[in-house]
Amino acid sequence: MIAVVSVALLALAQPKPHAIGVDCVVSAISAPDRASLVANALDGRAQGFDALISAVRICGRDQWNAEQQGTMAGAAMSIFLRDDSAGKLTAVGVPTREIDRWFSEQHAEFQTNTEVTDAEATRLIDRLHGQGFAMELLDANGTAIGTYLGALIILRRVEQGLPID
């Protein structure tokens, strides 16, 4: 019985395979390349992704298929975008823990749905406003809030083994 429990605990303690891959990709990209990737993504430019592609290839060691490569690239980008938007929000006094708390309270379908409706986004903004954040501050930082929320959704999809497209 103890052996079974020990094996079960060890299995639970092991990082999920996707987490190992994402960690590898994230750590393989330099801070300047991360900044460039984020800037290009936020500006809608589909360029400058060489560092990301290279990191995915190195970390995948030619063992990831195209879908897995896309998942690792998308997860890494989501981490970069989440961290960038978290920094921006924190700098203006909007703690991301409030967004995290709101997100965790949403049903599982919402947490993995890449199409956030205006009504759902309004619920988040109203919640933050109700916690004392000025509507002007929230409006001025709507892009960072939306980017942060979008990154949480993509990362939840990856965590659950769902495609990110």
Region spans (language model):
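Compositionally biased, proline/threonine/alanine/serine-rich low-complexity intrinsically disordered stretches
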Residues: L12-K16, I164-D165
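Immediate post-signal-peptide N-terminus of mature secreted/exported proteins
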Residues: Q14-D50, S54
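Residue-level marker of positions within ordered structural domains that often coincide
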Residues: V7, I29-S30, W64
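Mature extracellular/secreted ectodomains of secretory-pathway proteins
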Residues: G44-I164
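Sec-dependent N-terminal signal peptides
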Residues: M1-L12
